[in-house]
């Protein structure tokens, strides 16, 4: 394999367990406001609005808007679906819950795996999250990124080509010197189309026990790994010696 200098990571679902974290944050809010909903189902309903909220931005119908703002808008819509009018809850409570995405826990292998990978490669998120969200998450979870490049840096949301290409450009690297690491086959397909290398990491619990999508690699990815530690093992075998740029 040709040298890979930077590993660029999808975050929600690949590095952190968004579903459990959002459910944990939502549960006391729902109880406090008398909303009889399962916290994990509530998290799923909130997450289902994630991609549609970005569609208007990708199409150009709406100017680029940070994910924190989209998350808050989506939260208000989901709360309304559950019978809670926005004005009936203190704005501070809504704000705190909308930032649940800043406080997500890493998968058990994430920190140790990233630390190993960092020794040989530049590691950075390539996420639809905004800089403040990713920074707060990293500080809380101990994610050892070399750089934090939120979507507002590229002014594009995956799977737009600009999201991948501008990230590589900002790092001063050709697309082929970067590897996209994700638990989502669609993300990898978009990255591969614009010249990035690809690594699939299975996260079969991302969507809970009923998950049916992305249980296995479905494309010709460069690496398929069980977790980040396995990814480190495979890259160490494939790429000797160290390939960090001078």
Predicted regions, residues:
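Generic structural signal for small/hydrophobic residues in well-ordered secondary structure
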Residues: 10-13, 75, 125, 191
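Active-site neighborhood of HAD-like aspartate-dependent phosphohydrolases
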Residues: 1-48, 81
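Asp-based, Mg2+/Mn2+-dependent phosphohydrolase catalytic module
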Residues: 1-4, 85, 111, 115, ...
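Short, acidic loop-to-helix structural element flanking the phosphoryl-transfer center
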Residues: 64-69, 84-124, 161
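Hydrophobic alpha-helical core bundles mediating ligand binding, dimerization, or RNAP-core interactions
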Residues: 22-30, 46-50, 71-72, 94-101, ...
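Alpha-helical elements of Rossmann-like donor-binding domains used by nucleotide-donor carbohydrate transfer enzymes
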Residues: 24-28, 45, 73-77, 96, ...
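Tryptophan-centric aromatic hotspots in well-structured domains and transmembrane helices
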Residues: 18, 104-107, 145
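A metal-dependent, Asp-based hydrolase signature
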Residues: 34, 40-43, 48-95
């Amino acid at each position: 394999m040709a040298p890979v200098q930077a590993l660029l990571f999808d975050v929600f679902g690949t590095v952190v367990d968004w579903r459990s974290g959002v459910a944990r944050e939502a549960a006391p809010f729902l109880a406090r406001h008398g909303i009889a909903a399962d916290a994990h189902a509530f998290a799923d309903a909130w997450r289902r609005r994630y991609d549609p909220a970005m569609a208007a931005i990708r199409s150009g119908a709406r100017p680029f808007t940070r994910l924190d703002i989209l998350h808050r808008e989506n939260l208000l819509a989901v709360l309304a679906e559950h019978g809670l009018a926005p004005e009936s809850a203190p704005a501070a409570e809504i704000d705190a819950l909308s930032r649940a995405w800043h406080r997500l826990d890493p998968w058990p292998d994430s920190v140790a795996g990233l630390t190993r990978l960092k020794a040989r490669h530049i590691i950075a998120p390539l996420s639809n999250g905004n800089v403040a969200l990713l920074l707060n998450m990293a500080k809380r979870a101990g994610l050892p990124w070399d750089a934090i490049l939120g979507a507002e840096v590229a002014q594009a949301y995956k799977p737009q080509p600009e999201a991948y290409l501008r990230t590589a450009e900002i790092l001063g690297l050709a697309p082929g010197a970067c590897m996209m690491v994700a638990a989502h086959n669609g993300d990898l397909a978009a990255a591969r189309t614009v010249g990035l290398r690809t690594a699939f990491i299975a996260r079969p619990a991302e969507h809970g026990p009923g998950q049916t999508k992305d249980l296995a690699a479905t494309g010709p990815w460069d690496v398929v790994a069980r977790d980040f530690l396995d990814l480190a093992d495979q890259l160490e075998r494939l790429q000797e010696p160290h390939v960090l740029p001078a």
